[in-house]
């Protein structure tokens, strides 16, 4: 659990760096208002088997695209990361919801 807390902390710092680099104060304000919910969601998503490695690969792809000043590739990498995180979260939630009896 402590390891996952640290992983979520590092992941949050990575995303905060991206929000700051965007220079979009409105985005930063929205994110700060949602911080607690996002931390919970990140923890659930990153705890899903295989998701941590996928997340690190997605972050690497995003950073490489930004470093190369490749806007289209960065947008694509961000979209893929968000879609994968959403799918993982939905799978995780569906596995933990009580099943309806027929």
Regions found by a protein language model. Give the residues of each.
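Short loop-to-helix capping motifs
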Residues: 2, 24-25, 69-70
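Short, surface-exposed loop/turn segments at secondary-structure junctions
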Residues: 4-5, 46
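Solenoid-repeat scaffolds in large eukaryotic assemblies
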Residues: 6-7, 74
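Short, charge-rich, low-complexity alpha-helical interaction segments
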Residues: 25-33
């Amino acid at each position: 659990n402590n390891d996952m807390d640290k992983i979520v902390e590092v992941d949050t710092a990575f995303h905060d760096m991206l929000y700051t680099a965007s220079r979009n104060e409105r985005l930063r304000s929205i994110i700060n208002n949602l911080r607690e919910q996002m931390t919970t969601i990140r923890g659930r998503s990153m705890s899903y088997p295989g998701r941590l490695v996928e997340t690190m690969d997605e972050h690497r792809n995003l950073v490489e695209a930004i470093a190369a000043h490749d806007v289209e590739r960065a947008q694509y990498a961000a979209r893929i990361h968000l879609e994968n995180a959403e799918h993982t979260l939905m799978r995780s939630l569906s596995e933990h919801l009580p099943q309806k009896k027929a």
